Amino acid sequence: MAQKKYLQAKLTQFLREDRIQLWKPPYTKENKEVGLAVKDLAKKYSERLECCENEVENIIEEIRRKAIERGTGNEHYRTTGIATIEVFLPPRLRKHDKKSLLETRLHVTGRDLRCQIAETFGFQENYIKIVINKKQLQLGKSLEEQGVTHNVKAMVLELKQSEEDVRKNLQLEEEEQNEAELKERRIQRTKRGLEILAERAEMVVDPETMPYLDIANQTGRSLRIPPAERKALMLAMGYHEKGRAFLKRKEYGIALPCLLDADRYFCECKELLDTVDNYAVLQLDIVWCYFRLEQLECLDDAEKKLNLAQKCFKNCYGENHQRLVHIKGNCGKEKVLFLRLYLLQGIQNYHSGNGEEAREYLNKARQLFKELYIDPSKVHNLLQLGFTAQEARLGLRACDGNVDHAATHISNRREELAQIRKEEKEKRRRRLENVNTLRGMGYSTQAAKQALHQARGNLDDALKVLLSNPHMWWLQDADPENNSRQASPSQESINQLVYMGFDTVVAEAALRVFGGNVQLAAQTLAHHGGSLPPDLQFSGEDSSPTPSTSPSDSAGTSSASTDEDMETEAVNEILEDIPEHEEDYLDSTLEDEEVIIAEYLSYVESISSAAKNN
């Protein structure tokens, strides 16, 4: 298949260079049948490519037929408005490399298109996902709204792995339906779990009792990132980790939607993309996923993604990895990423008909593989010392295969990370204490968090921020119990403020604004010379009684408990796939890469062998 793709790409190049239009005479007759001139063309190009004339003729005929189909489709679209979509099916449903075309109007919804694809090609509608232009098709929006155009490519991802005789075996069909439902639920739980963890990252939680995710730099220390970008980055990295977990299990059809979601969220924090290598790794993972799904043809910008990854690595690691070496002391582990990059660049060039470029990249990948290959006995020696296989591989690559140096490196890194985690945990604990201190003074959790963020964690400065910005005190918590407001403050509270020297009317207004909180009202009035600041004076007019709990509220207890259980399940499922080792993305046995490098090098070698023989 790969060799045929190469020939197709080369012949397409030749046809463009020679400005040959196969859909016109003398290559196509009036009745659209093949003309005799195609044979002459096949002979000319087969000599140029040093390969079988008959094979070249067959591929030229395929290209000619596709060109005619495209021209017919274009004319049909101009006259009727009915668009043609090229559907790329899973490998088990492809028939002799024949194109699968579907006609539709572009005002229909994504759900309509999914239904049409399911009916046409024999899928169960709820168990497929459609990817167009590297985005999942949204069911509720029209195709036009989602940028779907005439002649677009649509890839079908099947959430169940059907057998050819699935319809003959009812028991097997039922099992596979259950499997598909399970996979769909997993995808939905992934989304919810990541949203919960991203929200917790913005909350002040006790790290001892509530799991949360954090974003760290290459040394393992937390990064200060603006809240809006932080949430987008958290979701991007979370989806990426989940996608990588599916990649490890070779569940490429489920991995791809996660990776594409990660790409979408990364694009919401573009200023950070050049400073972290995560985005570059994601581009590699997306191209790798398309390749393993045998759908590289659907990824029109594979070359662009790989170039983007290369540029991002250079920005993050520096010229010749100088910045990386300065931070980490070595770059041995990161070479795994460059091996994957060169391999994919080799594959992409081969599929594009660029044999020499493919050979160059594949040879670079092979050279890196030789450098990164690890003697199993050395891994065994480190296992005997109590290290994990992952630590052993990473340590040996960081230390050029020296076992003693690797053992020291791993031990030092363990100690360094333990210290960093201890410091980060203490920092989180102090922040929690500071928030609770401000809450004890009457401020909302949200106001306390924002003030501490502005004051870079300093409690005294945060208090000054709050006193200088009373409008912040109305930042509300999610918990309505923390947002109580009083229509009529108690006389006792009013008397307390009057006793402190404040005017009765002003005291009552302040208590209305601050929900009866005497301490907040007193602090505000004292800070502003005995009166409410203008931006808070209207609040007292709008105060309304806190709604009392109705009997129906208690009826939701069971439902809330169920929702909480589901959220816990979703979070736990995410946490299971978040690797404990911060350099997990750099760890690979390189077994798959070794096989694929050899396979594609054999393809490019066969090209040069044919050239020499001729």
Curated annotation (Swiss-Prot):
**Localization of this protein:** Nucleus
What InterPro entries has UniProt attached to this entry? NUB1, NUB1_ubiquitin-like_dom, TPR-like_helical_dom_sf, UBA, UBA-like_sf, Ubiquitin-like_domsf
Domain UBA: residue ranges: 373-413, 423-469, 488-528
Where do the segments described as Disordered lie?
Answer: 531-590
What the protein does comes down to:
Specific down-regulator of the NEDD8 conjugation system. Recruits NEDD8, UBD, and their conjugates to the proteasome for degradation.
Q: Where is this region: NEDD8-binding 2?
A: 549-597
Lipid metabolism among keywords: no
Protein name, per record: NEDD8 ultimate buster 1
Write out the GO biological process terms: positive regulation of proteasomal ubiquitin-dependent protein catabolic process; proteasomal protein catabolic process; protein ubiquitination; response to tumor necrosis factor; response to type II interferon; ubiquitin-dependent protein catabolic process
Q: Which gene encodes it?
A: Nub1
Q: Where is this motif: Nuclear localization signal?
A: 413-430
What keywords are assigned to this protein?
Answer: Coiled coil, Nucleus, Repeat
Q: What is its main location?
A: nucleus
